[in-house]
From Swiss-Prot:
Name assigned to this protein: Uncharacterized aminotransferase y4uB
Single annotated GO MF: transaminase activity
Residues with N6-(pyridoxal phosphate)lysine modification: 290
PROSITE patterns: AA_TRANSFER_CLASS_3
Length: 467
């Protein structure tokens, strides 16, 4: 199909309110023209001008099975022809929904019981908050409502989930965070550790800080702790050694529920089916989205543990119906898409590929970047990784933010045919390619990234920056 690029660009600029975009710069043309993405195959996309790009970020960590999977498209089409929609209120269901729910309960870590569906990770975390509050009301603990998140954690950008997100620019001018949401310290050893402090010692200190926060707030006022197994948007930061063991001990001590936000790490990204399995996490509630349908259809799920669900069911005679749900909860097309995606994940062992190819990817990142004078840390797990740039490597000092080093490297990579994300916190280049990525494609990604980094290093030297 041939499109009129100028016409589409004008329509887009005149009518689309783009997320996370400087609105005045976009409206006046100061930002680049809209990128009109037309097609995708494997780990590559193509724009309307014919430019091919390796998508080193799987859209937004989500196109795990790669682009152009006909088996998923066909599953969506079959379901749309057969039954495009019916709701799941009042005990209505479809075969695809029941099959998907059974699969999720069986594959999820811990003792899970039920699955509630939404359309995005943000709304799924809104559901988790309501479940925590509902659960504690039914237990006769009406004050046990505060939810603790982490600085630099990302859990969405709606009202409650945006409050959970621990980055101030998601709150500024939006009247967030809500008072029920608190934030504890980020578990990033590179920046947060005291001199000589080991990872285990640092983890113990972070756990002690959480314990102190709960004691200060009052254990009868704290209902849940929400966290990603691996910090995602906050910098693609795996937890330090001993972190999850120490954190879970604090939560059990104070009868605080653990919500594992697996929106990014679910369905193979770390090399395990769930990040919780990778790190020995035993959650009470699990949030999934993105990889659930590989973004072929919007669908999210809040997976509810037995402990929580039993309280909800036991309280039903007293409080009546579970009064929460969306028009599109359990959408049959979304369920069909998810089942087709999970078939691919299991048949092609994508967690295993993330483990094997991801190990190669991590090794290549360290080999090519760890010793560069502007690189402070190379980190990651499975098929997610990050390079963090610093102005003074020896003394761990950041670049002047006005230099926008991370954004410049991201642009230089894009100019060379690679999408790698400038992460919003610090000068960080992030990677999260589709889980179908091969070692040969890793070589392409790393080679393009290396050229981009070195080109920006040359620019900095020309501008008089001492490296």
């Amino acid at each position: 199909m041939t499109i009129d690029i100028k016409d589409i660009s004008e329509k887009d600029r005149n009518t689309v309110l783009h997320p996370f975009t400087q609105l005045k710069d976009f409206a006046t043309g100061k930002l680049r023209e809209p990128t009109i993405v037309e097609t995708g195959k494997g780990i590559r996309i193509q724009d309307a001008r014919g430019n091919q790009l390796i998508d080193g970020f799987a859209g937004l960590y989500c196109v795990n099975v790669g682009y152009g999977r006909t088996e998923v498209a066909e599953a969506i089409s079959r379901q749309a022809y057969r039954l495009a929609y019916y709701h799941s209120y009042a005990a209505h269901t479809t075969d695809e929904l029941a099959i998907l729910s059974d699969r999720l309960v069986k594959m999820a870590p811990g003792k899970m019981s039920k699955v509630f569906y939404g359309m995005s990770g943000s709304d799924a975390n809104e559901t988790q908050a309501k479940l925590v509050w509902y659960y504690n009301n039914l237990r006769g603990k009406p004050t046990k409502k505060k939810i603790i998140s982490r600085e630099r954690g990302y859990h969405g950008c709606s009202v409650v989930s945006g409050s959970m997100t621990g980055m101030s620019f998601y709150h500024d001018h939006m009247d967030l965070p809500l008072p029920q949401i608190c934030h504890t310290g980020v578990p990033h050893h590179y920046w947060g550790a005291n001199p000589g402090e080991t990872e285990r010692e640092f983890s113990a200190r972070r756990a002690a800080e959480l314990d102190e926060m709960i004691e200060t707030l009052g254990p009868d006022n704290v209902g849940a702790f929400i966290a990603e197994p691996v910090l995602g948007t906050g910098g693609i930061t795996p937890p330090p050694e001993g972190y999850w063991e120490a954190i879970q001990a604090v939560l059990k001590k104070h009868d605080v529920l653990l919500i594992a936000d697996e929106v990014i790490t679910g369905f193979g990204r770390t090399g395990s089916m769930f990040g919780s399995q990778h790190y020995g996490i035993e959650p009470d509630l699990i949030t999934v989205a993105k990889g659930l349908t590989s973004a072929y259809f919007p669908l999210s799920a809040s997976i509810v543990g037995e402990k929580v669900y039993k309280v909800l069911e036991d309280g039903a005679d007293r409080v009546g119906a579970f009064s929460h749900g969306y028009t599109y909860s359990g959408h049959p097309i979304g369920a069909a898409a998810a089942n087709a995606v999970l078939d691919i994940v299991e048949k092609e062992d994508l967690p295993g590929n993330a483990r094997e190819v991801g190990g190669y990817f991590q090794a290549q990142l360290k080999e090519k970047f760890a010793q560069l004078p502007i690189v402070g840390e190379v980190r990651g797990v499975g098929l997610m990784g990050a390079i963090e740039f610093v102005g003074d490597r020896e003394n761990k000092k950041r670049f002047d933010p006005l230099l926008k080093v991370g954004a410049r490297v991201s642009k230089a990579a894009r100019d060379r045919g690679l999408i790698a994300r400038a992460m919003p916190h610090g000068d960080i280049l992030g990677f999260a390619p589709p889980l179908v990525t091969t070692k040969e494609e890793v070589d392409e990604i790393v080679a393009m990234a290396e050229k981009a980094v070195r080109s920006v290093m040359d620019e900095l030297v020309r501008d008089g920056q001492k490296l």
